[in-house]
C-alpha cells in the first residue's frame, strides 16, 4: 500500500504526539488485543498477561519502538523492519492475521488518547501505515 505525502505527514504528526507514552500505548494495545481476541494469548504462554504486567509493558515497548522505527524510515520500511520480519516469520511463526488485530487495537488506543487529533484523514493514514507495516512483517512468510 502506497502512502501519499499527506499520509506520511499525518502519520509522523500523530506518532509525534504519542511522545513518551509510546510504550504505554503499545502495552495498552496489547492488553486490548488479548481481551478482545483471546486466541492471540497463545503466542505468549510464558507471559503474565494480567493488567499492568511488566512482561506486557516490556513487549508493548518493543512494539512501540518498532513502530517508531517504521515511522522514521517510512520510505524504506522493508529494510528498516527486515530483522523483525525474519523473527516473526521464521522463529516466532506468528499468524499474519494477528498483525491486523493488533493494528486495530493500536488505532483504538490512539483514538482513545487523542480524540481531537484522530480525524478521519489521520485515521485513514494511520490505518494505511499499519497495513503497510503488517505487509512488510509478513513479506518473508512465503
From Swiss-Prot:
O2 binds at residue 59. The modification Phosphothreonine is found at residues 9, 109, 135, 138. One of its GO terms (molecular function) is iron ion binding. Heme b binds at residue 88. GO terms for cellular component: blood microparticle; haptoglobin-hemoglobin complex; hemoglobin complex. The modification N6-succinyllysine is found at residues 8, 12, 17, 41. Residues 2-142 form the Globin domain. The modification N6-acetyllysine is found at residue 17. The modification Phosphotyrosine is found at residue 25. Red blood cells. The keyword Signal does not apply. Keywords: Acetylation, Heme, Iron, Metal-binding, Oxygen transport, Phosphoprotein, Transport. InterPro entries: Globin, Globin-like_sf, Globin/Proto, Hemoglobin_a-typ, Hemoglobin_oxygen_transport, Hemoglobin_pi. The modification Phosphoserine is found at residues 4, 36, 50, 103, 125, 132, 139. GO terms for biological process: hydrogen peroxide catabolic process. Heterotetramer of two alpha chains and two beta chains. Involved in oxygen transport from the lung to the various peripheral tissues. This is Hemoglobin subunit alpha.
Amino acid at each position: 500500500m502506497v502512502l501519499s505525502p499527506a499520509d506520511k505527514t499525518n502519520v509522523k504528526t500523530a506518532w509525534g504526539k504519542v511522545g513518551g507514552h509510546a510504550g504505554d500505548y503499545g502495552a495498552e494495545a496489547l492488553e486490548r488485543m488479548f481481551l478482545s481476541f483471546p486466541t492471540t494469548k497463545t503466542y505468549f504462554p510464558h507471559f503474565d498477561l494480567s493488567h499492568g504486567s511488566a512482561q506486557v509493558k516490556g513487549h508493548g515497548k518493543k512494539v512501540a519502538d518498532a513502530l517508531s522505527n517504521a515511522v522514521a524510515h517510512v520510505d524504506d520500511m522493508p529494510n528498516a523492519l527486515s530483522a523483525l520480519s525474519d523473527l516473526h516469520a521464521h522463529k516466532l511463526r506468528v499468524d499474519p492475521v494477528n498483525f491486523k488485530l493488533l493494528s486495530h487495537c493500536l488505532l483504538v488506543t490512539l483514538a482513545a488518547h487523542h480524540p481531537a487529533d484522530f480525524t478521519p484523514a489521520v485515521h485513514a493514514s494511520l490505518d494505511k501505515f499499519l497495513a503497510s507495516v503488517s505487509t512488510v512483517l509478513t513479506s518473508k512468510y512465503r
